[in-house]
Amino acid sequence: VVNEVSKTPIPGVYELRIDGNEIFYTDAQANYLIEGNIIDVRGKRNLTEERITKLTTVKFDDLPFKDAFTIVRGNGKRKLAVFEDPNCGYCKRFERDLQKVDNVTIYMFLYPILGADSVEKSKAVWCAKDQAKAWQDYMVRDVPVTPAMCDTNALTRNGEFGRKYKITGTPTLFFADDTRVPGAADATQIEKLLATATKG
């Protein structure tokens, strides 16, 4: 489904936005479909990447917090949202580093993208009596999760949200100033990003 057609800086070439955030290009008669990036060589800018970033920007306050659980440390004044998969090795390393960060509220979005086992583990964590404890026990202390049953539609919604906003890897971090960081950050980087986000 074509959502939008708009001009590009190249005469006769138009941008097609398809299925929400997919970008393609075409000629004025729509005889040709071009897949790839438009690079502004003089300006040293990837215009396609900039456009996708703009389309997939997520305002922190617009995150679907009802589909996350919270972990509060210290006064919880600073805020961080994280999309993670329980089978992601980088997420486990990130979680260990995150233990060193205090005075923060962490909104944890379970985002099982690494297979069926990730889905089962995410369901077990989501359905646990104490989600935060079950998550940290598994991710930091390697304590197996106990299977449990409950409404797990939040996991489906997290998957839909992630696809819509191109969350393609875990962990993906969101800060209160709308900064998005793909990949694991260490405690020092997290502290810097939280400090910057809190200034705003």
Explain the meaning of each model-derived region.
Residues 1-123, 137-140, 144-170, 187-200:
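Extracytoplasmic thiol/disulfide redox context detector
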Residues 182-183:
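Short, exposed beta-strand-loop hairpins at the edges of beta-sheets
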